[in-house]
């Protein structure tokens, strides 16, 4: 009986210390402005919805079809999902985005993930768009991307009776279908692409959600100063100074220099295990190398191998639970639908 009691007491003490350690780490995370995706769907909706373009089931379903429809591109070959592939972490897995006529991005910019992009404070690497509705208009028109003028996109969509009917259900039959409305609808779908992870489970109170290495990685991530730029719910997503201490070793690949003040949007770290290659020009393929490079150029510290391994384990814990997306059957083109062009 005495042995059993001692073992039981030991287990209770161990459990108590474990809980205390987890509570301390959560407090540390909160102090570093690391915030979880809420557990409640109602709270998530408050986080991602906007009064100017509210989420409805009809808009989400229509937006999903438009997101996957290559007819929004001039060639009829490229959809939003081409560069922001929902099966590939919301990115495309190549250093620089490939667009119209198989042209690589002229600035050698990497495609950011669309997952959790609603949590960003700005969109694009130079932060030029304030929200998803504005962002969705850019790639469709950009010559090196989808290369489709506004009028062409609108004519294609309005020529397809099934789309006209769906827009009527989503917005009312009197609402005019415009290019801006098409982009707004895509944005509604993108707002639903939020991926809570076991990291969020831990911050929301589940002590066992992260293992020892992941917790050590989270603590190291905070202690080294990584959360300074990769904080908030998004773990990034806002404008930050780049090359604070020294030059990025691949700075000469591409001509991107940030916004007018040299600031760069810090990418979200959510699902980062799935979104290699890394950095704005996609020149680093491993998390280990990315961690060490960031320590050097941003923080001015040499992150040792053990610390790097722990941070890497933490970053992998940010891989989230994806919403189930059923690939849509798109409505057929009609006789007066403008034809694709590769010119």
Feature-to-residue mapping (PLM):
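Generic cytosolic/nucleocytoplasmic N-terminal low-complexity/intrinsically disordered segments
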Residues: 1-2, 251
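Gram-negative bacterial Sec-dependent N-terminal signal peptides
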Residues: 2-18
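Periplasmic c-type cytochrome electron-transfer domains
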Residues: 19-343
């Amino acid at each position: 009986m005495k042995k059993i009691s001692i073992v039981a007491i030991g287990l209770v003490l161990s459990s108590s210390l474990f809980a205390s350690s987890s509570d301390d780490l959560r407090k540390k995370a909160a102090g570093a402005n690391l915030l979880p995706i809420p557990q409640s769907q109602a709270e998530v909706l408050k986080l991602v919805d906007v009064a100017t373009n509210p989420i409805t089931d009809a808009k989400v379903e229509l937006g999903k079809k438009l997101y996957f429809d290559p007819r929004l591109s001039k060639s009829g070959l490229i959809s939003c999902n081409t560069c922001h592939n929902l099966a590939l972490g919301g990115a495309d897995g190549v250093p620089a985005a490939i667009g119209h006529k198989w042209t690589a991005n002229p600035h050698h910019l990497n495609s950011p993930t669309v997952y959790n992009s609603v949590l960003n404070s700005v969109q694009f690497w130079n932060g030029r768009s304030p929200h998803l509705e504005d962002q969705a208009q850019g790639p469709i028109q950009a010559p090196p991307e989808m290369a489709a003028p506004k009028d062409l996109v609108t004519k294609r969509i309005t020529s397809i009776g099934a789309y006209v009917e769906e827009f009527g259900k989503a917005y009312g039959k009197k609402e005019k279908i415009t290019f801006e409305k098409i982009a707004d609808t895509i944005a509604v779908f993108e707002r639903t692409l939020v991926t809570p992870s076991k990291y969020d489970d831990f911050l929301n109170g589940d002590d066992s959600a992260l293992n020892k290495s992941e917790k050590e990685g989270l603590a190291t991530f905070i202690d080294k100063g990584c959360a300074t730029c990769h904080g908030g719910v998004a773990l990034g997503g806002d404008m930050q100074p780049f090359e604070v201490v020294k030059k990025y070793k691949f700075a000469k690949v591409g001509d991107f220099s940030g916004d007018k003040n040299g600031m760069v949007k810090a990418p979200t770290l959510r699902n980062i295990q799935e979104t290699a290659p890394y950095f704005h020009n996609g020149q680093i393929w491993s998390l280990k190398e990315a961690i060490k490079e960031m320590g050097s150029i941003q923080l001015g510290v040499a992150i040792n191998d053990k610390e790097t391994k722990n941070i890497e384990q933490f970053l992998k814990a940010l891989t989230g639970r994806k919403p189930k997306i059923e690939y849509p059957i798109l409505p057929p083109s009609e006789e007066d639908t403008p034809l694709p062009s590769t010119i």
